[in-house]
């Protein structure tokens, strides 16, 4: 089993958001030395407790500070961006760190509704087809497979290179797993969001998987919230503030 880290860049009491970002880089360096496989950073906006608002920038910092880790987003919230812009951004990251960049994608806003509107000034209600269409466009842009009759067929994503970021679809529901399977992409189940039904979601992913140019068999991982300590009592003590912060809605600093 390969162990990886999903870092939400929590802000400690008495520390600043800038401190939290620097601590994320330091933690990634330690994880690199300990043999962890992947290091993903999250996207949240307007949060009083989480500092990671620009994962694409933090990924570059972490990849530059480490030697072996695969580094990526867990994830980029696609509702805020165009597929082309995300493809270009992660192609740039891959140009500097070929074969080490992961692109995890999600559909949640990572914010409250007002902040989501501020992120997208031309905000309009998003149809159910919007996210799957973005994923298809993004995969085509990344892999230079835009169909010849598509309005975007003449667009070339720069830079291009010998490697491509590894795309992962993130989710906590069977619909997310089914979409990842239908698209033929790796799937990451967010157990830390939905602690129930993970086995059923992964089975739905495997059952609906269709081989793609990027992946010929299902590939998945699971994100869990973990507290490590010398004793169970100490682990419970460390976990309690996080539980209270989560139950309060995440606004207060952990």
Q: For each predicted feature, which ranges?
A:
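Flexible, glycine-rich active-site loops centered on histidine and acidic residues
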Residues: 2-17, 79-146, 187, 195
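An alpha-helical appendage that flanks or caps ligand/catalytic pockets
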Residues: 124-157, 196-254
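Acidic (Asp/Glu)-rich catalytic clusters
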Residues: 32-33, 59-68, 90, 94-101, ...
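A conserved active-site cap/scaffold subdomain adjacent to cofactor or substrate pockets
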Residues: 177-196, 202
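Hydrophobic faces of well-ordered beta-strands that scaffold small-molecule active sites
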Residues: 3-7, 39-41, 71-74, 101-105, ...
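N-terminal beta1-alpha1-beta2 module of alpha/beta enzyme domains
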Residues: 1-69
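Active-site mouth loops of central-metabolism enzymes
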Residues: 7-22, 74-84, 161-171, 226-229
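Generic structural signal for well-ordered alpha-helices
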Residues: 24-29, 56-60, 87-91, 132-139, ...
């Amino acid at each position: 089993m390969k162990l990886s880290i999903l870092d939400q860049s929590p802000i400690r009491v008495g520390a600043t958001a800038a401190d939290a970002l620097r601590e994320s880089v330091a933690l990634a360096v330690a994880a690199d030395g300990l043999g962890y496989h992947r290091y993903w950073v999250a996207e949240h906006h307007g949060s009083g407790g989480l500092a990671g608002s620009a994962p694409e920038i933090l990924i570059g910092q972490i990849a530059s500070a480490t030697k072996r880790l695969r580094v990526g987003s867990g994830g980029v919230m696609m509702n805020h961006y165009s597929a082309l812009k995300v493809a270009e951004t992660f192609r740039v990251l891959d140009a500097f760190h070929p074969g080490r960049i992961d692109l995890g994608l999600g559909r949640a806003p990572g914010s409250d509704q007002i902040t989501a509107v501020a992120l997208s000034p031309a905000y309009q209600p998003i149809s159910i087809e919007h996210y799957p269409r973005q994923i298809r466009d993004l995969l085509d842009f990344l892999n230079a497979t835009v169909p010849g009759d598509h309005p975007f067929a003449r667009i070339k994503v720069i830079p291009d290179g010998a490697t491509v970021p590894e795309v992962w679809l993130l989710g906590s529901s069977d619909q997310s797993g089914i979409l990842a399977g239908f698209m033929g992409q790796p799937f990451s189940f967010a157990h830390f969001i939905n602690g129930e039904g993970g086995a059923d979601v992964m089975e739905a992913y495997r059952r609906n998987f269709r081989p793609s140019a990027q992946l010929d068999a299902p590939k998945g991982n699971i994100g869990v919230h973990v507290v490590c300590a010398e004793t169970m009592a100490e682990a419970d003590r460390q976990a309690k503030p996080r539980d209270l912060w989560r139950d309060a809605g995440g606004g207060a600093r952990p």
